Amino acid sequence: MYKWNSIIYDKNRIMKVMIYIISLCNKIHGGEIYMFQNERFCTCGVIEEVPIVLQCMMWNMVDTMEVESKDYFQVFELSEYDGMQKIVHSQEMPEYKMEYLIKLQGAPIFVGKVYVIDDKTHSTMLKAEEY
């Protein structure tokens, strides 16, 4: 469990809520599945090593990115910068790059590369070394 904004979140509860929200989005759009709006999964490496708050932020970054179209392969480079979590979110086609600096409260800074891949039936978040 991680403390974020003075609230304690349970990993399993967060994942169930995220899946429920995605299901609602699919129903709202008449069952039509849009890129990254299908079932979502995280690999063991992500679940064990990437703080849940960062997992949720990365899913949200994919959901809210303003591009003409989303590439099936999203890249997140996470590092530490001046005591804060730095996240560089990018995709290849169409070209997209956005940098974020986040001050985390109670969650450790994660350093590494994470991919989010959509294969039209589900979306998976995995560490680069699990690819």
Q: How should each PLM-predicted stretch be described?
A:
Residues 2-103:
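N-terminal "domain-start" segment
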Residues 94-131:
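Short, compact, well-ordered microdomains
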